[in-house]
Amino acid sequence: MEILRFLLSLFIYFLLLNLSLSHFPSISAQRTNHENFLKCLSHRINEDDSRIIHTSKDPSYFSILNSSIQNPRFFVLETPKPVSIITPVQATDVQSTIKCARLHGIHIRTRSGGHDYEGLSYMAKSRPFVVIDLRNLRSITLDVDNRTGWVQSGATIGELYYEIGKLSKSLAFPAGLYPTVGIGGQFGGGGYGTLMRKYGLSADNVIDAHIVDANGSFLDRQGMGEDFFWAIRGGGGSSFSVVLSWKIRLLDVPSVVTVFKVVKTSEKEAVSIINKWQYIADKVPNDLFIRAMLQKETEVYASFPGLYLGPVSDLLALMKDKFPELGLEIGNCREMSWIESVLWFIKGESMEILAKRKRTSRSFKGKDDFIEEPIPKTAIQYLWRRFEAPEARLAKIILTPFGGKMSEIADNEIPFPHREGNLYEIQYLAYWSEEEDKNKTNTEKYLRWVESVYEFMTPYVSKSPRRAYVNFRDIDLGMYLGLNMKTKYEEAKVWGVKYFKNNFDRLVRVKTNVDPMDFFCDEQSIPIMKYVNDI
């Protein structure tokens, strides 16, 4: 019996080995494919191709690659590097890249701002690849009279805020807090920030898009169709196409808003106030956004930063009625314009900082959960005490309130499904210095801290499935391995339903229709089915 088991195992091993070897070309064939791809692309590009094509032999290669690695955890020698980087300057360059890549069997990744939590926009773990870096496609055109704008995917949300702020003090757009995040990734996964309770996600306010599909065709909303347009707004746009630009809806904000921050250093008081926050943060008027945060400097503390779309007098009256436990006073508050509030949240001094690009210096690992019922005070107390660990010296736990507009939008309106019924989303983040990445043991202790907090929270978070936000990508949820004879759909459903709930199957249908050869793929991309009717 043991001999039979051994022979069976040996047979399976060689079968899998044969399959893997037949699936990927030899090293020499890969090199030839890449050379032919570059010849094809050079022939198609009308301009000076040195501005667009960068191989490892070029002086520009490493400066371009490294400039947008926004998690230094992957800024190490072991991280797989692209065989070349393409920096298109116009839509036809992207079309040519896709056509040549398909013709010569080249795998691609698309990078906007480089903020993918797991680095999947600029690395691939299983095969040679080319990065399409959209840094040169960053134009922003705003129409204040019609309250719309076009913004290219290579722009950052900071650049978008900057352009809005230059033109108007009474218009805004709902996106994230960190100005260096790329538009392509932010909108493609959903995108939220301080205006989410008032206006929803970034993707909720996208009304058209320009893309290049897997055939190299240039399409707008009408050309791609409503299912395709639905999928790229929150379903991870890079699974379906290269999104070149987005048409957005600009939204009204009052000329005066109020920002505030309250800090609590007493464990007992902080735990009590966070507990109360759970019961009111999603139910207060839509004009009010209050986050709760745990972190550590010299000591552990809780902070409650927020934005109110109105004057301080109205805010103080509202807080006295709805959340007196916080003890908000006029000294905690500042009136300003909305664009100034964007700067306040990042501790910036001038608008120009929004338009500057820089690479972060801290490595990190993040996980997140959605909370449907208030967690017990004992759990909050546990989270506070986890910051006593040495590896939590730079860590953060961020609680972001939902409710408001987020609860008014149907969970299938776009692929982002986390709507009504969610009190808040909670993120667990560990940070460490880039220098510490040189020692794997150092890195592992930070990863374990995040994992331990995540495991502790299991009884208190969403279930069946335990859900997650695709823009906070977590490779621990699963990735394509090609083992156990499972189809890609079977593998992907493990994490796909966590990110997209019941919208996952519709995303698979769209993917199968628009990219049947699975050209746009990564370790957690939307899969295809062999037959659409299999779903």
Curated annotation (Swiss-Prot):
GO cellular component, one term: extracellular region
Cystine residue pairs: 40-100
Pfam family, one: FAD_binding_4
Cofactor requirement: FAD
Glycan attachment sites: 18, 66, 146, 215, 439
Location of Pros-8alpha-FAD histidine modifications: 115
Gene3D superfamilies attached to this UniProt entry: 3.30.465.10, 3.40.462.20, Uridine Diphospho-n-acetylenolpyruvylglucosamine Reductase, domain 2
Signal peptide: 1-22
Single Gene Ontology MF annotation: FAD binding
Expression tissues: Accumulates in cell walls of etiolated hypocotyls.
Entry keyword Nucleotide-binding: yes
Keywords, ordered alphabetically: Cell wall, Disulfide bond, FAD, Flavoprotein, Glycoprotein, Nucleotide-binding, Oxidoreductase, Secreted, Signal
PROSITE patterns linked to this entry: FAD_PCMH, OX2_COVAL_FAD
Domain FAD-binding PCMH-type: 78-253
Subcellular localization(s) per the UniProt record: Secreted, Cell wall
InterPro entries the UniProt entry points to: BBE (IPR012951), FAD-bd_PCMH (IPR016166), FAD-bd_PCMH-like_sf (IPR036318), FAD-bd_PCMH_sub1 (IPR016167), FAD-bd_PCMH_sub2 (IPR016169), Oxid_FAD_bind_N (IPR006094), Oxy_OxRdtase_FAD_BS (IPR006093)
Transmembrane helix listed as a keyword: no
EC numbers: 1.1.1.-
Family: Belongs to the oxygen-dependent FAD-linked oxidoreductase family.
The protein's name: Berberine bridge enzyme-like 27
Organism expressing this protein natively: Arabidopsis thaliana
